[in-house]
């Protein structure tokens, strides 16, 4: 039976289980035209571990992460934003049995409510991210 998120989640509460492919301190390229080019993941929204306190938080496709801009426009650098993971290299399995893996990792910068800051998304976007975040689906040109 699929699990459904609690009140802490932002966006659509239903969450597919996706194998985490992006972890703390990962450098990830940005797939939109918000002005940021490269970000570092500094947190995963909604992640907690009751049993293992040393576990490094991981995020998969469709998860919201907290990032700091490392490369991009000077007014955006060193600023903290939230972002949605739209692609990951690590393979994950869909409920129909197919395995999906992209050739790069990518995030889209969003507001705390989940609305994208940019007006277009470059490259393909995973179906799991578009089902959980409908506003990202509106900007996506290719949905895989």
UniProtKB/Swiss-Prot annotation:
**Pfam assignment, any one:** Ribosomal_L14
Per its UniProt record, what InterPro entries does this chain match?
Answer: Ribosomal_uL14, Ribosomal_uL14_arc, Ribosomal_uL14_CS, Ribosomal_uL14_sf
Extract one GO molecular function annotation from the record: structural constituent of ribosome
Recorded GO CC terms: cytosolic large ribosomal subunit
Q: Tell me which Gene Ontology terms the entry assigns under biological process.
A: translation
SMART domains xrefs: Ribosomal_L14
Going by the UniProt record, its keywords in alphabetical order are: Ribonucleoprotein, Ribosomal protein, RNA-binding, rRNA-binding
Q: Which family does it belong to?
A: Belongs to the universal ribosomal protein uL14 family.
Indicate the quaternary assembly: Part of the 50S ribosomal subunit. Forms a cluster with proteins L3 and L24e, part of which may contact the 16S rRNA in 2 intersubunit bridges.
Q: What does this protein do?
A: Binds to 23S rRNA. Forms part of two intersubunit bridges in the 70S ribosome.
Q: What is this protein called?
A: Large ribosomal subunit protein uL14
Q: Gene name on record?
A: rpl14
């Amino acid at each position: 039976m699929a699990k459904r998120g609690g009140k802490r989640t932002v966006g659509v509460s239903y969450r597919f289980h996706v194998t985490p492919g992006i972890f703390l301190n990962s450098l990830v390229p940005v797939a939109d035209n918000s002005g940021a080019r490269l970000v570092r993941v500094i947190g995963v929204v909604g992640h907690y571990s009751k049993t293992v306190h040393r576990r490094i938080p991981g995020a998969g496709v469709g998860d919201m992460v907290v990032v700091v801009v490392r490369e991009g426009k000077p007014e955006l650098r060193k600023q903290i934003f939230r972002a949605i993971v739209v692609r990951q290299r690590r393979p994950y399995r869909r409920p129909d049995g197919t395995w999906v893996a992209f050739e790069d990792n990518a995030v889209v910068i969003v507001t705390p409510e989940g609305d994208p800051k940019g007006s277009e998304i470059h490259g393909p976007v995973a179906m799991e991210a578009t089902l959980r975040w409908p506003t990202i689906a509106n900007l996506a040109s290719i949905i895989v």
